[in-house]
Amino acid sequence: MDLVAGDARDVVLVLSVDDTGAFSDPDRFTAHLPLGGGLDPTWLDLFSEAVRSVTGQGEPVDFLDARTELDGTAETVERIVERVDTDWVEAVAAVPDDLHGALAGRWIELLEEELGLLPREEKPWIRDMAGRIVVFTRKAAGARDVIFAWGF
């Protein structure tokens, strides 16, 4: 599962030849955030809710509602490839630095409400991921496309 900022056609090409290492090429892609297989896409809806909660804003919308599937990728790519709405990227990028700790804490609270108590050893990587998502969106703001690629 990856978030990638750059030209959608280049992202699809990289995925079609299964060369995700190319996402780290800054000449081709503005930003890349590998989310790994341990993160469920619905967790990003809870992340969006955490952003709204700590900022007191109505944005971003849930991540599910901020995605639109790219047409014509099913025959070339084994993943679901979706464009992420610019407003979602900009709303997350606008989270002030002094709220990162609160954002991570709120995300963990929401995850625990949904899944039950998380093991203590899971929380540090979730806190880290919250910060990495904000950093990614700041780099991705203004990119031609922001793509979410994931598999079942």
Predicted feature descriptions by range:
Residues 1-135, 139-143, 151:
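Acidic (Asp/Glu-rich) sequence patches and key acidic residues
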